[in-house]
Amino acid sequence: MQTLFKFFKKYNSLSLEAEKAIAGISKIIHIKKNTDLQAIGHTCKTIYFINSGLARIYYFKDGTDITESFTFENNIVARIESLFTGKPSRKAIQILEDADVVAINATQLFKLYNKYPEIERLFRLIFESAYVDTVNRIEGIQFHTAEERYKTLIKEAPDVIKRVPLKYVASYLGITQVSLSRIRSSK
């Protein structure tokens, strides 16, 4: 749990009492590679912190597997739209490497907001950051070429090529594997 609380400190400090409250609604789980942490059609009720390993969010469009995002160690992953609306998600969270994950019960977490305003502030800041990342991702698709998106990905996550199957990287970039190979060989 210490890694989780270190991550939280990047956003907002918590009192020891607030940390204990979060620890009380969290559990550490081990997930095997290629397992869906949350399946398509599931209503999200858990916020996950990746202690070790790697996850991706994906969905199917016209029968094609599309990768929306990757989440590396020391970061949060959840289906936020499902979490806040209470509706089943059309996307899944898949573990790409054996992973140790902290699962935070979101229903219980939200109940802590009134008692611990610092927890509410913490998660507001985390969700704001996730929103900004989403906007940046959308703008990357709208305004940048595939090669520029690839360079940005390598700059932000240099290990992605070593750790993620190229079909998922290509899908994330919105290109075919052949196009990704061309971009990589032109370097």
Predicted segments with their positions:
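Cyclic nucleotide-binding regulatory module and flanking cytosolic helices
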Residues: 1-27
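Short beta-strand segments in beta-sandwich/barrel cores
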Residues: 27, 54-59, 100-101
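Glycine- and acidic-residue-biased ligand/ion/polar-headgroup-sensing regions
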Residues: 34, 45-56, 74
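Short phosphate-coordinating micro-motif centered on Lys-Gly-acidic
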Residues: 37-42
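Cyclic-nucleotide recognition modules
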Residues: 67-125
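Short, Lys/Arg-enriched N-terminal segment that forms or immediately precedes the first helix
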Residues: 130-139
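Phosphate-/nucleic-acid-contacting segments
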Residues: 144-187
